[in-house]
A protein has these predicted regions:
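Nucleotide/phosphate-binding catalytic cleft detector across ATP-hydrolyzing
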Residues: 1-173, 191-192, 202, 215-217, ...
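A short acidic Gly-Thr/Ser loop motif
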Residues: 49-50, 174-181, 187-190, 199-203, ...
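Hydrophobic alpha-helical bundle architecture
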Residues: 275-283, 287-294, 312-323
Length: 348
């Protein structure tokens, strides 16, 4: 079972803004779900974490083993523990991605048992502002009085559901077009190479459409029903829109609507392209780019991106073998999928 509750203004750019209002909406969601489940009580929840300040940083841990050293499981564990103890200034570590190992400066995917004098582990840390996690814990655990089973980094969970192991190995960028933010996750060699967030999402497009003198709910409907990432300015087709008072209809040109959408989407995409180019991996993305999320369903978006980046861009909700329907279900499914072997964030 799944349920949806409109976040309104309590979530801004993927982050909890109003703790009390968020708690109220979560309690309503839990009640709706329990009713759908025939009165079964929900005791714990997994929470997906994303938002504006989320990003990856590099952190390297080294250990000198001496001339007769051999890498052991204990050494690998000690490197990981040292990495976990690292506290970057003004940031909270939300997840630690599996590292790349270098033995005497040479890459090694399976280091245990290999002799070397020095081992280096290069980690990708997923970090964010402390409030990113604290506000979630406060709204759910403290205000709503619901136990949190674990907090998972949403883009990583989504990557495990949408991308195949082969795509991650060949090199692939996963771009999640959300309501408040757009997330760029780049994989290479089977591992996460970069994670960054652009603080623009589909909500901005909806707000721009309201400048055509329509209310926000009607603007969202127009975007979903008629919207295109590329405007056909020679198209004379008109569409009917509801008046602000809901008591009548008027007409606007489809080209005018999509001109508004195209302008804002171009701004979002230029920011996405800049983040992709900054990774230095554009030339080695053998599996191309996969787009997902509600905003990714915008008509002609894959073609617009493919033309600009000169590589394959495809829309995908889930990879083969995973059954789901709709972006909201996929987002939820990604948390369930990754919480099985799980690496949930400590909430202490």
């Amino acid at each position: 079972a799944y349920e949806v509750e409109n976040s309104g203004t309590c979530i801004r750019r993927g982050c909890v803004y109003n703790v009390k209002e968020t708690a109220s909406k979560i309690k309503r969601l839990i009640l709706k779900l329990e009713n759908k489940l025939g009165g079964t009580k929900i005791g714990q929840v997994y929470v997906g974490l994303g938002g504006q300040s989320l990003r990856s940083i590099e952190h390297t841990v080294c250990k000198v083993l001496g001339t007769e050293g051999v890498v052991t499981e204990e050494i690998i564990d000690s490197l990981y523990q040292e990495c976990k103890d690292y506290r970057p200034d003004m940031l909270t570590v939300l997840d630690v991605v599996s590292p790349s190992y270098f033995l005497d400066d040479k890459p090694e995917s399976n280091p245990v048992g290999v002799p070397c004098s020095r081992i280096e582990a290069r980690y990708k840390l997923i970090v964010g502002r402390p409030s990113l996690k604290l506000n979630i814990v406060n709204s759910i655990s403290e205000q709503a009085k619901i136990e949190i089973a674990g907090i998972l980094v949403s883009p990583l969970a989504l990557g495990d559901v949408v991308l195949s192991d082969n795509e991650k190995d060949l090199g692939c960028a996963l771009i999640g077009f959300g309501a408040g933010v757009t997330t760029i996750s780049v994989y290479k060699g089977g591992k996460l190479a970069s994670l960054s967030v652009v603080p623009f999402g589909g909500n901005l497009i909806t707000k721009d459409i309201t400048n055509l003198r329509v209310v926000e709910s009607e603007a969202e409907r127009l975007k979903i029903t008629y919207g295109s990432a590329k405007a056909d300015r020679d198209n004379d087709m008109t569409i009917q829109v509801s008046l602000a008072d809901g008591m009548g209809l008027r007409e606007i040109k489809l080209a005018e609507l999509n001109g508004v959408i195209e302008a804002r989407m171009d701004e979002i995409l230029e920011n996405v392209y800049a983040r992709l180019e900054a990774t230095g991996l554009m030339s080695v993305l053998g599996a191309g780019i996969v787009i997902t999320g509600g905003g990714a369903a915008l008509k002609n978006l894959p073609a617009v991106m493919s033309e600009r980046l000169k590589m394959e861009v495809r829309y995908s909700a889930v990879r083969k073998g995973v059954v789901a329907s709709g972006d909201l279900v996929v987002a939820s499914l990604s948390l369930i999928h990754i919480s099985e072997p799980t690496r949930p964030i400590s909430i202490s």
